[in-house]
Amino acid sequence: MSIITEVYAREVLDSRGNPTVEVEVYTEAGAFGRALVPSGASTGEYEAVELRDGDKARYLGKGVLKAVENVNDIIADKIIGFDVTDQIGIDKAMIELDGTPNKGKLGANAILGVSLAAARAAADELGVHLYEYLGGVNGKVLPVPMMNILNGGEHADNNVDVQEFMVMPVGAPNFKEALRMGAEILHALKAVLKGKGLNTGVGDEGGFAPNLKSNEEALETIMQAIKDAGYKPGEEVKLAMDAASSEFYNRETGKYELKGEGVTRTSEEMVTWYEEMITKYPIISIEDGLDENDWDGFKLLTERIGDRVQLVGDDLFVTNTTKLKEGIEKGIANSILIKVNQIGTLTETLDAIEMAKRAGYTAVISHRSGETEDSTIADIAVATNAGQIKTGAPTRTDRVAKYNQLLRIEDNLADLAEYHGNETFYNLKK
């Protein structure tokens, strides 16, 4: 046993140039852990609270000095003296100290920074990798990357409504080859876009962000890039989408306004559109296909295509076991997106993954659009054998940091490493 002797937070920058929280944890034996907290652009209304200062004269109101102060002046006093390996105890103490259902008092960004830094310090204390500390001898499955190579919605300044169009190299023999395939497709996509005279600037997550005639044109363009890179769509590479539908849902009219296309759809019309798209294109995963509060629409979507396509709840479930439990009971979706900062502690994150697995739901470990060099989610993906990771295009250091960490983990696991490819979608009809 080694106790925590120091907890220190500071304000640093994320990949969008906005402030975020960095926390360091030290133990009496000299162990050390550091964690940086990510931040989202499109956020679910039920997410844990990210505490911002609100001072418009400083970082346009997005400073996090209050959260930093909460770590240094309040949380540190509570956590110092804890056994660094008592992750559940540490997280429980912070939740109780905050005392709100959404971590609104101290801030999920303050609490999460301490939670993740403590886990890293514990791994350092024991002389093991983070994935080994969290997953033990069983953590050995490298995730299929869900690579966002074409951006729209809140992640880009263009006229594409759907937020993310992704490729999944399901036919790769291992993670290393999957990453290579994704990178080659990204380069092929750039050439396709240039050939069409389209913009090759990138969005928040490293994918290209051109103006296109329709959301379907995005799918067609990616299909061409896959072929140009020398791969077979549907066999070696499948497509995935994050609609982030809450961003274009009009709650007053109850309709979906796809302004880029100049189209308005009802829930049922959205479901029909998705059904058409999965028939025409090798789409294996759709995230947030409907608004987070449109549970009737989600139920219909699940009934119509849930046996053929992974239906991921992000804003729908916000990594929250209460929301997930309700979804499981009602037969809504069949997968959950896992974002550590949506819930605010490592313990609650692992609980959500475990609940999903027990119910036959898949779990996709995810970054946020505002990221840092922190690669914790790569270790979480392997530790939990989640089988999937969503962490942007294979470009920009904030995204590549996670991919490079997975390469290191695969090397370290050597012959024990597994890559499940198509078998990742175990809850779908083959």
UniProtKB/Swiss-Prot annotation:
User: Which UniProt keywords are listed?
Assistant: Cytoplasm, Glycolysis, Lyase, Magnesium, Metal-binding, Secreted
Q: Which residues form a coiled coil?
A: none
Q: Name one GO cellular component term.
A: extracellular region
Instruction: Name one process (GO BP) from the record.
Output: glycolytic process
The chemistry this enzyme catalyses reads:
(2R)-2-phosphoglycerate = phosphoenolpyruvate + H2O
Q: Where located?
A: Cytoplasm; Secreted; Cell surface
Cofactor(s) the record lists:
Mg(2+)
Primary location class: cytoplasm
Keyword rRNA processing listed? The answer is no
Q: Name one Pfam family in it.
A: Enolase_C
- The domain of life for this entry's organism is Bacteria
Q: Which residues form the active site?
A: 205 (proton donor), 339 (proton acceptor)
Enumerate the InterPro entries for this protein.
Enolase, Enolase-like_C_sf, Enolase-like_N, Enolase_C, Enolase_CS, Enolase_N
The UniProt annotation places (2R)-2-phosphoglycerate binding at 163, 339, 368-369, 390
User: Molecular function (GO) terms listed?
Assistant: magnesium ion binding; phosphopyruvate hydratase activity
Asked if Metal-binding is a keyword of the record, the answer is yes
Task: State its Enzyme Commission number(s).
Answer: 4.2.1.11
Q: In which pathway does it act?
A: Carbohydrate degradation; glycolysis; pyruvate from D-glyceraldehyde 3-phosphate: step 4/5
Binding of Mg(2+), residues: 242, 287, 314
Q: How is the cofactor bound?
A: Binds a second Mg(2+) ion via substrate during catalysis.
Q: Which PANTHER family match?
A: ENOLASE
Q: Which NCBIfam families match?
A: eno
Q: Which family does it belong to?
A: Belongs to the enolase family.
The UniProt function text for this chain reads:
Catalyzes the reversible conversion of 2-phosphoglycerate (2-PG) into phosphoenolpyruvate (PEP). It is essential for the degradation of carbohydrates via glycolysis.
State the name under which the record lists this protein: Enolase
Which organism is this entry from?
Listeria monocytogenes serotype 4a (strain HCC23)
